[in-house]
Amino acid sequence: MSKDVVIIRGEALADVAAKLAGEKEIFIVQDENVAHVAAAVAAALGGVKAVIGLKTSEELKTMETAVWVTERLLQADASRGALVLAIGGGITTDIAGFAASMYKRGIRYANIPTTLLAQVDAAIGGKTGVNLHGYKNMLGAFHMPEFTFLTSSVLETLPEKELRCGLAEMLKTFLIGDADAYSRAVSSGFSAKNLDGQDKNGLPSRKNAKIQDELIFRAASIKADIVCRDPLEHGERAVLNLGHTFGHAIEHCSKGEIAHGEAVGMGIILAARLSEGLGLAQKGLAACLEKDFQRVGLETACPYGIDELASAMKKDKKDGRFILLKGIGQPVITTVKEDDLRKYTE
């Protein structure tokens, strides 16, 4: 997989039409919750071959759902030259991308992510896949999208829970790749309640909209750069999993009650504590991150003990590798003994 990671910024959904000019065979795979977004895109394109609607949840992110999408493509006579256009959050882009990777041994796809988490993480980099027996992304493929189209216009009505998830992934990206952007993000007044920040009276402030857009694009660009250097995750790309070893275990233990981004936020704090305990980071890092995360409205306390987490981690595909921190902007990939894991995270 040697394709470049292409990110396009747009002021409005209609801007994507220029990128898709000349495409004769577009199939939209949409999250049914954002059908209005897909309708606007289809109108801007002057029509599409078919729209395939998905009900989205971690429980429905399965091989059966991905195969169902391929069946819809087959019924609509999609050719090898077709383009799947995924419109929705990370679950939608994961399923649509995986279906595209399987159909006729691989057809093209592109993403219009409609959640903050998908814009800064899930829709970028070509990782596609589905869950297996409740374990995250056990089946999948590396299949690079033709492009990912980013516009903050689709985030204006995003629920608070979705904003929390996206903020956690955004801060994760800055923690591994840009200390200055991390500082800017936690000091700009953003929160899970109001992505644009607040003015001195505590009211929503649109003056931060430009900063918001810049930070979203910066986070997406950091991930894109890492993926270009290591598309198949043989080395550096693994740092993007900061907080994910703990996070996936938290998700599994919660049986879906704690969303992915929320779990990653909690996982980053646990990873920081482990980093301190192993002597990789100076004392105080975890407390500093915890304060920052709480400031923007993220939950930081993991509700599960290490016994429950360790059991779930044994099924994790990262095989005992942890992404830890020497400091902000200084990730390190390492293996951790179970004794140390228990000692420093209990």
Language-model features: locations:
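Generic secondary-structure signature for well-ordered alpha-helical cores
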Residues: Q75, M144-T148, S153-E160, A168-D180, ...
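Short glycine/serine/threonine-rich phosphate/pyrophosphate-binding segments
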Residues: I91-F98, Q119, A249
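A glycine/threonine-rich phosphate-anchoring loop and its flanking beta-alpha core
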Residues: F98, M102-S187
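C-terminal charged capping/lid subdomain of soluble metabolic enzymes
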Residues: A168-M170, L280-E346
